[in-house]
Amino acid sequence: MEQDYKPHEIEEKWQKKWNESLIFQADPDKREKFFITIPYPYLNGNLHAGHTRTFTIGDVVARHKRMLGYNVLYPMGFHVTGTPIVGLAELIASRDPQTMDVYEHLHGIPGDILPTLDTPEKIVDYFKREAEKAMRMIGYSIDWRRKFTTTDPTYKKFIEWQYIRLEEKGLIVKGSHPVKWCPNDNNPVEDHDILYGEEATIVEYTLIKFRYNDLVLPCATLRPETTFGVTNLWVNPDVDYVKARVEKDGNEEFWVVSKEAFRKLTFTDRTVEYVEDVPAKSIIGIKLTNPITGDEVISLPASFVKPENGSGIVMSVPAHAPFDYLALRDLYDADLSEYGITEDLRDIKLISLIQVPEFGEFPAKEIVESMGIANQKAPKAEEATKIVYRREFHGGVLKEITGKYRGYPVSKIKDVLTRDLIASNAGETFYEFSEPVVCRCGTPCVVNMVKGQWFLNYSNPEWKAKVYKCLSQMRIIPEEYRVEFENKVDWLKDKACARRKGLGTRLPFDKEWLIESLGDSTIYMSYYIIARFLERGDLALEQLTLSFFDYVLLGIGDSAAVSAETGLKQELVEEIRSHFNYWYPVDLRSSGKDLVPNHLLFFLFHHVALFEEEKWPRALAVNGFVSLEGQKMSKSKGPILTLESAVSAYGADITRMYILSTAEQTQDADWQKTGIDSARRQVDRFYSFAKDVIESGKRATLSTELKLIDRWMLSRMQKYIMETNIALDSIQTREAIQNSFFLLINDVRWYQRRGGEALLYYVLDNWVRLMAPFTPHLCEEIWEAMGHEDPISLAQYPLDNEDLIDEGAELAEEAVKSTLNDIEEIVRVTKMTPQKVYLYTAPAWKAEAIRCACELQIEAPLEVGALIKTLMANPELKRFGKEIPKFVQKIIPEFKSGGAERYETFAYLGLDEQALLKESASFLEKEIGCPVEIYSADSPEYDPQKKSRFAEPLRPAIYIE
């Protein structure tokens, strides 16, 4: 081995060997298979550290399973459909300054190449090459024979087949539905199309129609039941309002809304015409009619009303909304004469409509006063609002003032009341984003009620029932995300599945539409199996007929008929079908948590719709995001750390180890330079250890006579092997690395510090295999240096041997270590230079007391009185009656706080502490730098300060001269 660890040299060497040996190409054989997939990357930029985490987790699982003897298929494709790549090409073609800057300096595209990427096709070709290069650089064990892009003509045939079959099942419908919409592109937008607001959802509001003469001033609310408690409306005097003619279902009305709201209304299923501007001042101070109660309410000025939210006019419920109460109270002494308001606003009576266990009649007033909130601008106002809203929603019940709705839980009234409001023309539904959304083209998006749009009928209860069944049979990792998936299924509504612009596959039964980018990425895992035969040159485009897909993917029809129709050999058709039957279903789909409400959900829906139950996915795993020095990464805006630049700077294995060890599962990771530098130092230590062991030439086996420290090392190794396998099975990569590296390296250091050397080769042999899924290049290099000809990637992963677990050795070594630590702490605190150290092991009666406590706790939880009574009943112990209560009161808390296992091992194995410490005396003397003498507290030959009385089992008393 080289003297120093040179990651790039090692990594290039082994990537070349893997590529030449084809060891990651997987075809059916007699082994048990494991088919793992991760979402293929979207090619509108270079892969970044966020991709690195998801992809590397997938690779670790694949490598682990491969070393456990599974036949592992880990394939990869490239997603390019939709509008982002088209939009990027247009920006590059127009030399948009921000785009050119981001893609040259953050994505690292050379300045002479970037301007040439001015068509979608050129962008796809460029980023496809770059993505594969980056994935190879970091060492992913991918079967590259199966790669494809979602604009391949053969893939389009596959998508056409899928949508024809979904339409035949009645799962694709045509109608009107609210969708995220870019007015500039005149297209629905999905998450991949969005510049800002990727996590925004479409929220259904209820518009309450407050009337003033022949005008309607609509107010949007998520809580229509609070209309019973409205005392006034809020109008912003600085906002531009308009009068509009609004017609829906033959009903014509004139509405007053903000200009921003007017624009949004034009995208709804209403006919909307501008009539005239309306000065804000003219609608402040007017008296309107509450459409539910018939009460008269006044409109008041409020600068906090945002024109872009809802209608730009807000209803006020001061009894239940802290902001409304504070805003109204802030106006009590204001001069509102310019609006013609002369009333004393203190005369406005709060209206209580919800009974909440934690509050009295007016929750908003109560919480404002109890929290000491001075005005509406106080920081605590937002917190107060959330508290009241949460408690009312989850525990509130409507009062008698709500009439026939009395007794309804707040959480269940919205749909019922909204339905009634619409029927009486007192309200309408209105859709709004949960946060602003901007298309990648730079245009603010709107919620558009599209007519004649194609939708996937995800609201279909029978379809949902199959998804629930699938989920109930699946493993969800981590398990707590099961509820998240079930809730998302419950809430999922019909979704637009087609667009008019972008890259993609034409809807086979309506060629004017293109299938949108999430809709064509649901069952592509099955296409990986077909892609193998496409790569081999066995299939032509025209042979990919509906009957072909029906047979090879669904088993419908027969091979002879498919052969006759397509011209394919019957044996080939049957071979493809057998490959599908071997590999399917997907054993694990691993992805980032941002894809739970969309891609992962649609993955389940489409699988249960098309495939038989035995082919439904078996497991889903979810992981968190990656930020860069505390900032969210963005391919289009920055900051960004590309996968290639990370590997170029630090090496593949260091990058892998760092990204896998910084956070667990759904926790978000933060890439920090200090952290990656630390990972480099740790990997250096591992390399140095391996080099030293190999160069020593020692090859001791387990048949060698073992000392206590050897038995300890063997036992610890078995536990780390066991814990690593358990962690990897649950895809807890941080926990796995903690056990297979950080904890283990500490124990190896202790083993060497204690003079252990007989098992160093055994340790390395297991350690290097434990680490192979995480740092595969380095481990291949070490494995080869150890004399192995076959790659470590195909070696047997370590499995723990329970026969080698030695609890006694572990307890004994823990006692030695803790004794040394105690001595060192005393020396540090006293600042003395020890001349001699005396150790006193526990007297026999205390050891017996521990044994009795262990037996007693089997029957019932330990209690002071019961243990004292038991000990005092023992004639041998009774003579220590004065000391027993103190000792019992000391050890019981230790038993209850996690010390029971140590004491049980001590008692049942009969650890001889005096013999142990005498055997370890030379080690202690070397560490402390002075002589050490060991006595039993039962007969101390030298104890000038009576320290022996403090001796306890596993904690000898110490006297230092």
Swiss-Prot record:
A GO biological process held by the record: leucyl-tRNA aminoacylation
UniProt short sequence motif 'HIGH' region, positions renumbered to this chain: 41-51
CC terms in the record's Gene Ontology section: cytoplasm
Domain of life of the source: Archaea
EC number assigned by the record: 6.1.1.4
SUPFAM superfamilies membership: Anticodon-binding domain of a subclass of class I aminoacyl-tRNA synthetases, Nucleotidylyl transferase, ValRS/IleRS/LeuRS editing domain
Catalyzed chemical reaction(s): tRNA(Leu) + L-leucine + ATP = L-leucyl-tRNA(Leu) + AMP + diphosphate
GO molecular function annotation: aminoacyl-tRNA deacylase activity; ATP binding; leucine-tRNA ligase activity
Main location: cytoplasm
Keywords: Aminoacyl-tRNA synthetase, ATP-binding, Cytoplasm, Ligase, Nucleotide-binding, Protein biosynthesis
Subcellular location as annotated: Cytoplasm
Gene3D superfamilies tied to this protein: Class I aminoacyl-tRNA synthetases (RS), HUPs, Isoleucyl-tRNA Synthetase, Domain 1, leucyl-tRNA synthetase, Valyl/Leucyl/Isoleucyl-tRNA synthetase, editing domain
Annotated motif 'KMSKS' region, positions: 632-636
Binding site for ATP: 635
EC class: ligase
HAMAP family: Leu_tRNA_synth_A
Family: Belongs to the class-I aminoacyl-tRNA synthetase family.
Record-given protein name: Leucine--tRNA ligase
